[in-house]
């Protein structure tokens, strides 16, 4: 039962027989939650050393993306007089 509890909150209602739209909505929800990627990854056995490498890479990528987003947000602030000074 514990394996199925995570699927309780992913119920999508089919409105007016629109099965394709409901399927797209469900697929988007599962992708945003990371479940599709997790299921694909667990399809085959992953050696412990490869798992550590993957988790380390994902951590580095997450840190890089957060820092890059912070720098871009700093550069794109609207309260500066002229964001393109000297051009």
From Swiss-Prot:
Parts of the chain that traverse the membrane: none
Alphabetically ordered keywords of this record: Mitochondrion, Ribonucleoprotein, Ribosomal protein
GO molecular function: structural constituent of ribosome
InterPro entries according to UniProt: Ribosomal_bS21, Ribosomal_bS21_sf
Highest taxon, organism lineage: Eukaryota
Record localization: Mitochondrion
The keyword Lipid metabolism is assigned to this record: no
Keyword Methyltransferase: no
GO biological process, alphabetically ordered: mitochondrial translation
GO cellular component, as recorded: mitochondrial inner membrane; mitochondrial small ribosomal subunit
Pfam families: Ribosomal_S21 (PF01165)
Self-association state and partner proteins as the record states: Component of the mitochondrial ribosome small subunit (28S) which comprises a 12S rRNA and about 30 distinct proteins.
Family per similarity comment: Belongs to the bacterial ribosomal protein bS21 family.
Protein name stated in the entry: Small ribosomal subunit protein bS21m
Source organism per UniProt: Bos taurus
GN (gene name): MRPS21
């Amino acid at each position: 039962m514990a394996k199925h509890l995570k699927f309780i909150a992913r119920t999508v209602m089919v409105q007016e027989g629109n099965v394709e739209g409901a399927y797209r909505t469900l697929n988007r929800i599962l992708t945003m939650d990371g479940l599709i990627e997790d299921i694909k990854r667990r399809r085959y056995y992953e050696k412990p050393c490869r798992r550590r490498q993957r988790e380390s890479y994902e951590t580095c990528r997450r840190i890089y993306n957060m820092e890059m987003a912070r720098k871009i947000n700093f550069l794109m602030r609207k309260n500066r007089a002229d964001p393109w000074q000297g051009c």
